[in-house]
Amino acid sequence: SVRENVEVSALGAGAGPRRAAERADDLLARLGLDRYADAPAAALAHGDERRLGVARALAMEPRFVLLDEPAAGLPEAEVPAFAELVRSVRDEHGAVGCLIYPNMALIMEICDRLHELDQGRTLAEGAPAEIRGNLDVAAAYLGETAVAEE
């Protein structure tokens, strides 16, 4: 079940059965999955599967969270809600995070600090406002022609 998926993660991180069940119920409620708690995880829609993955990760009470293209495959209409979920993970759980995602608008909205790479090389590091105005980043993501026309 969806609940068992989250409980197993908490148990694997050392929580006792009671704490694992409490943690699962809390996370499912906070991530909007409580109505599916007893449903098979395989029956979830894609966006709900993504939220379940976040719940499983948070059940382990990590200090660091790596999100590698967490909204990949979601319909565009669901991306803002998922961005809000990522923000709440950052703000409420206090975990340091690393977010890998090609949608620069989403990255700029969610992240406090960016490390931009192009072909494995660092282009720039800094706050979103600094990165937004960086010509090397613009050239890499928009193409040199687009930068020259601006």
Q: Model-predicted segments: where are they?
A:
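Conserved catalytic motifs of ABC-family nucleotide-binding domains
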Residues: 61
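Catalytic Walker B motif of ABC-type/P-loop ATPase nucleotide-binding domains
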Residues: 65-69
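Conserved ABC ATPase "signature" region
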Residues: 7, 18-36, 84-88
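Conserved ABC ATPase signature
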Residues: 40-44
